[in-house]
Amino acid sequence: MADSDEWDADNFEPNEPIKIATAGRLDRWEGEDEEEDVKDNWDDEEEEKEEEKKVEQKIAEVKPPEKKKLSDKIKEKELLQKKKQEELKKNQETAASESLTLEEQLAEKARLKKLQEEADMELAREAFGVDPAAANASTTVNTTNASGIEAMCPSSKDDFVTFEKLLKEKITQFEKSVHYPSFLESLFRELCISLEVDDLKKISTSLSVLLTEKQKQEKEKKANKKKKKGVVPGGGLKANMKDDFADYGGFDGGYGNEYDDFM
């Protein structure tokens, strides 16, 4: 009996580890339930982040665009101006390379100049928000504020009168030069190439009248020089007096003959 009791005791002791192992298995399953709760929390956080992003995007869409600074506008204007000038320069080089007559070249230059002025005006309007009516009004030059020929952009008759005076003052500074006459001849010819025939006739008539007046003045100067020479050999003052009386019949066939007839 003692052996059977010992066997029973031996068989009884191993039961406790089995219970512990079973308990261990139960604890492991309980941990799995907790992990599932953590995953659910992560999903909630991700959904909240997505909602926050959507709200931020809506706020960014509703937010009005910021106004550009004046310095940024000026930089944009300079870039556009540079690009426009490069295009105009390229067009000028292309026009010069072609076989054009002098008149056609001048017309092309005038066209390109007009395009450049229009482009400058358009850039100013876009960059600074200038009213088109105000921009057109500003093309009329205020002569009191003009700083020289470069500042002139004549459009009215009075503007051209002022422009004429400034050009005259500029050009006549060099009238003492020996090259001045040839310079004017070439300048007038180049300036008059694009004119119509009727306009050329007016200019030609005006210059012809000026030539006649200058010739008349020159003759008068020569006559005055001769009178200032004084007594001329071969009769002098008496001879001149005799010539004056000769206009009224002279000494031979004038008053003397009338006196003989009376007698």
Curated annotation (Swiss-Prot):
Coiled-coil regions listed in the entry: 30-127
Residue ranges, annotated region (Disordered): 1-75, 214-235
InterPro entries the UniProt entry points to: eIF3-like_dom_sf (IPR023194), eIF3j (IPR013906)
Keywords from the named record: Coiled coil, Cytoplasm, Initiation factor, Protein biosynthesis
Biased composition (Basic and acidic residues): 51-75
Biological processes, Gene Ontology terms: formation of cytoplasmic translation initiation complex
A GO CC annotation given for this chain: eukaryotic 43S preinitiation complex
Location within or outside the cell: Cytoplasm
Gene3D superfamilies reported for this sequence: Eukaryotic translation initiation factor 3 like domains
Main subcellular localisation: cytoplasm
Keyword Transferase: no
GO MF assignments: translation initiation factor activity
Pfam families referenced in this protein's UniProt entry, alphabetically: eIF3_subunit
Acidic residues compositional bias, start-end: 1-13, 30-50
Self-association state and partner proteins as the record states: Component of the eukaryotic translation initiation factor 3 (eIF-3) complex, which is composed of 13 subunits: eif3a, eif3b, eif3c, eif3d, eif3e, eif3f, eif3g, eif3h, eif3i, eif3j, eif3k, eif3l and eif3m.
Family note: Belongs to the eIF-3 subunit J family.
Function recorded in the entry: Component of the eukaryotic translation initiation factor 3 (eIF-3) complex, which is involved in protein synthesis of a specialized repertoire of mRNAs and, together with other initiation factors, stimulates binding of mRNA and methionyl-tRNAi to the 40S ribosome. The eIF-3 complex specifically targets and initiates translation of a subset of mRNAs involved in cell proliferation.
Protein name: Eukaryotic translation initiation factor 3 subunit J-B
Protein's organism: Danio rerio (Zebrafish)
